[in-house]
From Swiss-Prot:
Free-text remark on how the cofactor is bound: Binds 2 heme b groups non-covalently.
GO CC term (a single one): respiratory chain complex III
Full protein name: Cytochrome b
Provenance organism: Oceanodroma melania
Any single biological process term in GO: mitochondrial electron transport, ubiquinol to cytochrome c
Amino acid sequence: MAPNPRKSHPLLKMINNSLIDLPAPSNISAWWNFGSLLALCLATQILTGLLLAMHYTADTTLAFSSVAHTCRDVQYGWLIRNMHANGASFFFICVYLHIGRGFYYGSYLHKETWNTGVLLLLTLMATAFVGYVLPWGQMSFWGATVITNMFSAIPYIGQTIVEWAWGGFSVDNPTLTRFFALHFLLPFLIAGLTLIHLTFLHESGSNNPLGIISNCDKIPFHPYYSLKDILGLMLLLLPLTTLALFSPNLLGDPENFTPANPLVTPPHIKPEWYFLFAYAILRSIPNKLGGVLALAASVLVLFLSPLLHKSKQRTMAFRPLSQLLFWTLVANLLILTWIGSQPLEHPFIIIGQLASTTYFTILLVLFPITSALENKMLNF
């Protein structure tokens, strides 16, 4: 019998073992679809971004008008830009749901996969931030100024780091040029990290909703999960194209229709909606360094998840108290997102401070205590 090139060819063999003959648990739900959706988001963003970069000029005098030119004069330029801008929002929706699923079902116990995932999140956040600056609108400029200025809170070397990042004494042409270079480069770093993420995942195999070892009951990835993923892709592309075609500016900031002006500060500086929860945590501490540390901790706390797992059960499927706590955390994050979009005045300040405190308390204190309590209740 002739050897099957799919199983013997060095390159095809790798693809086969990752996407075709990969043994997958038979009971993974739609919550496991988000990995492939994120791959689709990344591919879409790289493709649309490449097409946009062909028409973009990274210069403070031309950036804003080059984006307008893309939308007005380039064939389907408006569609490419709208898909890219709203694709970022859907990218983050998928990322947050993917992390939430990992947290709910205890997937963080695959430590290497989880840690590379958190690194991916940090890289994605950096990419989105530098990308937001490129259209050179008012909110782009002032967002860049405010967020990069945070690094000046680092004792002794802070101001030097900020001026080095800016390429001068304020956000100006050198800043825009380097941000464009970084925005072009980082998605390929994300693609590389994704391969590492997948390598670690396929080393241990996927988790499943029951949180038990599923070696005795595996099915091939293709055709079962490949078809399931295609359904997921369709369900993702439908709202994305709907948003891009019917209401492309829904999630954007109206300030960005005004070209950047260093002499006029917008009444309320805020980042894109997917960073608002972290922005609310940053603003809830009335000290610059404290705020920056809290901002960093709001994402870096995910690295501690494997260490804070005290339950004898892996998933939350059979842990009602932890479930209640998990959904409280979700509600808390939604409150933080809302607070981040509001001006810094009463009662939003105190709500933000309470929500920020609750966020860290749930993750660092209440989850381990609840897990230990559930172990005791179940006589583990």
